[in-house]
Amino acid sequence: MTQLKELPLTTLQFYATAPYACSYLPNKTARSQVATPSHLIHADVYGDLLNAGFRRSGLYTYRPYCDECKACIATRILVNQFIPSRSQRRAQKKHAGLEVFVLNLGYQEEHYQLYQRYQHERHAGGDMDSDDQDQYMQFLLQSRVNSRIVEFRDGPHDPHPGRLRMVSMIDILEEGISSVYTFYDTSSHAASYGSYNILWQLEQARTLSLPYLYLGYYIKESDKMSYKIKYQPMEGLIDDHWQKLLGHNIYP
């Protein structure tokens, strides 16, 4: 892992959690390394942490710190080199009529209801399946960096104009956009909203002249996390260094 002494984070403290059941790989235990205190993790500091493999969940900033497993690999897409695949171009064309609204962080009941439906459909029985409003707000609406809510709604020529289809939370940092969390309408299983969201974020990063889109952790053996490798060229943080992630050099 990147040595913390190499980072300008002398005022932060770091601790390791006790082992807990892994959310992604069955019969595995996990640990996290947590950065604290949260009130000192502003945009510049969080950018350094992100480059060292950390992510945030609300005001909680962490990275995998497992004793033996190295399955979680922090990832980022090289924005200016990205070329969409055929299926990604189809998703882009399919949803070109969606209207996009970029908002400041704030609670909206419509967002929360979509979040609940998404969790019940896609992650039934998971840690977030029963999140109440307070848990939802702590997870997605608390931030000390430049964060935004992105709404995707049906356009005026769709059968249901204005219908909320997807919500994405993003952080806009000095070196890139970090995709925090996305949830969407699951009523159409072939909708490919998630793919369209990543393509939209890539385009926004390109517009802002930002070199990277950070997608979080890639886990080869997890269906929930393995899709990220489809967005190339991608870099992964392996053995303390960002390097091209092509599939052949990934931990099993």
From Swiss-Prot:
<dbReference type="InterPro" id="IPR016181">
    <property type="entry name" value="Acyl_CoA_acyltransferase"/>
</dbReference>
<dbReference type="GO" id="GO:0071596">
    <property type="term" value="P:ubiquitin-dependent protein catabolic process via the N-end rule pathway"/>
</dbReference>
<comment type="function">
    <text>Functions in the N-end rule pathway of protein degradation where it conjugates Leu from its aminoacyl-tRNA to the N-termini of proteins containing an N-terminal aspartate or glutamate.</text>
</comment>
<dbReference type="Pfam" id="PF04377">
    <property type="entry name" value="ATE_C"/>
</dbReference>
<comment type="similarity">
    <text>Belongs to the R-transferase family. Bpt subfamily.</text>
</comment>
<keyword id="KW-0808">Transferase</keyword>
<dbReference type="Pfam" id="PF04376">
    <property type="entry name" value="ATE_N"/>
</dbReference>
<dbReference type="InterPro" id="IPR007472">
    <property type="entry name" value="N-end_Aminoacyl_Trfase_C"/>
</dbReference>
<dbReference type="GO" id="GO:0004057">
    <property type="term" value="F:arginyl-tRNA--protein transferase activity"/>
</dbReference>
<dbReference type="GO" id="GO:0005737">
    <property type="term" value="C:cytoplasm"/>
</dbReference>
<dbReference type="InterPro" id="IPR017138">
    <property type="entry name" value="Asp_Glu_LeuTrfase"/>
</dbReference>
<protein>
    <recommendedName>
        <fullName>Aspartate/glutamate leucyltransferase</fullName>
        <ecNumber>2.3.2.29</ecNumber>
    </recommendedName>
</protein>
<keyword id="KW-0012">Acyltransferase</keyword>
<keyword id="KW-0963">Cytoplasm</keyword>
<dbReference type="GO" id="GO:0008914">
    <property type="term" value="F:leucyl-tRNA--protein transferase activity"/>
</dbReference>
<dbReference type="InterPro" id="IPR030700">
    <property type="entry name" value="N-end_Aminoacyl_Trfase"/>
</dbReference>
<dbReference type="InterPro" id="IPR007471">
    <property type="entry name" value="N-end_Aminoacyl_Trfase_N"/>
</dbReference>
